[in-house]
Amino acid sequence: MTNEEFNEGFRKRTRTFAATIINYCDDLPSLPSMKIVSYQLCKSSTSTGANFRAFCRGRSKNEKYAKICITVEEADETVYWLELILESGKDDSSRLHTSIQESTEILKIVAKIKSSFDS
């Protein structure tokens, strides 16, 4: 698989994940605390995909590195918000566990890409 093929597939994966999270957030309880968490979760999950897309379009190595660093931060934040929902006891569904697993996998992938720049 070429880098271009990987990037296209991963852009689709992060976009699909963001759409899944948007739908998940719409189904969370309408409690004041969950509105805040839901908002932050939607922001970080959509930013992960958007910043990976920007990484793919980077014009220089420095620009790509800056974008992949932001992508790692946003992916890590997404894992955080999902884990917080679990730990708060607001949800313990298989849907949440699947989202935690997918967000963790996405984080590992973008962290690995970032580490290739650090070498």
What are these regions (language model features)?
Residues 1-119:
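Amphipathic alpha-helical assembly/interaction segments
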